[in-house]
């Protein structure tokens, strides 16, 4: 995920475009990994950072603000740490959506299978 963010930050996109690129790139990466026979499951630490109370939807302004803050920290300190609840919840929602769309035998999703099915309302257009 950090690689995706670094690639996007190199493009110096406006916040909305960067958020759309992040969402699309993360979903694509997870989908590709789900089909890889060498990948046995997915695990993320995002819930350890902001908790298991994952919001079903986040407002675009909050997501964009979190991404801008993350970008500033990356430019100033050269490090990326996803500790913004709105972004972390988005990551979990993307993974949940992927898990619900693709019944992939043998793949496990830690924390994800216990979450209720949600709509695609989180996708940023």
Please state what every model-predicted region is.
Residues 23-40, 94-98:
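Short amphipathic alpha-helices and their capping/turn segments at secondary-structure boundaries
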Residues 32, 47, 52-54, 100:
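Extended, H/D-rich, highly charged conserved domains that either
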Residues 14-21, 25, 62, 83-87, ...:
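Alpha-helix N-cap and loop-to-helix initiation/capping positions
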Residues 1, 40-44, 106-108:
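Hydrophobic faces of well-ordered beta-strands that scaffold small-molecule active sites
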Residues 1-24, 30-33:
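Long, mid-chain structured domain cores
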Residues 51, 65-125:
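Catalytic pocket-lining loop regions of alpha/beta-barrel enzymes
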Residues 1-11, 55-81:
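Active-site gating loops and adjacent loop-to-helix segments of metal-dependent hydrolytic enzymes
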